Amino acid sequence: MKTPRIPIAIQQAVMRSLREHLAKANLKLERRYAEPTLVYQQRGTSAGTAWLEKNEIRLNPVLLLENQQEFIDEVVPHELAHLLVWQHFGRVAPHGKEWKWMMENVLGVPARRTHRFELDSVRQNTFPYRCRCQQHQLTVRRHNRVVRGEATYRCVHCGDLLVAEK
């Protein structure tokens, strides 16, 4: 799927959110952390990721277009908090007490680990498989492993080997 173009007004709103939250953190922590790079190339069902060593935030352009305000209010500070925690505390648990503190006490944003966005537009195709008790949906990756003979999968309920439906 081709990466959609993000309108300049949305990019500006995202950048404004990033800069406002970074300024708040720099003020409260009495530091001058560098502004991270924003990249709109995150794929799959992740809303965003923080690349610690690169000081980079990657955002999912499809989910951003579908959930603009939530990205500005929640996703941007969420990923920024990961970068700030890494720079301030070093290597710690990704959503541990330091991250929660950074989100709530420094950035003033509720600390939620996962988003609740509708994912139909970014979800991968699945392939129907069957056992003796039900139908299963395998991802493209798992289906291809079966086709190449690299893997087999069993039902967690009945233990039967999953077989592709015709």
UniProtKB/Swiss-Prot annotation:
Its main location: cytoplasm. Pfam families: SprT-like (PF10263), Zn_ribbon_SprT (PF17283). It is found in: Cytoplasm. Residues 19-164 form the SprT-like domain. One of its GO terms (cellular component) is cytoplasm. The active site is at E79. Zn(2+) binds at H78, H82. Binds 1 zinc ion. GO terms for molecular function: zinc ion binding. InterPro entries: SprT-like_domain, SprT_Zn_ribbon, Uncharacterised_SprT. It comes from the Bacteria. One of its GO terms (biological process) is response to stress. Its cofactor is Zn(2+). Keywords: Cytoplasm, Metal-binding, Zinc. Belongs to the SprT family. This is Protein SprT. It comes from Klebsiella pneumoniae (strain 342). The lineage of its organism: Bacteria, Pseudomonadati, Pseudomonadota, Gammaproteobacteria, Enterobacterales.
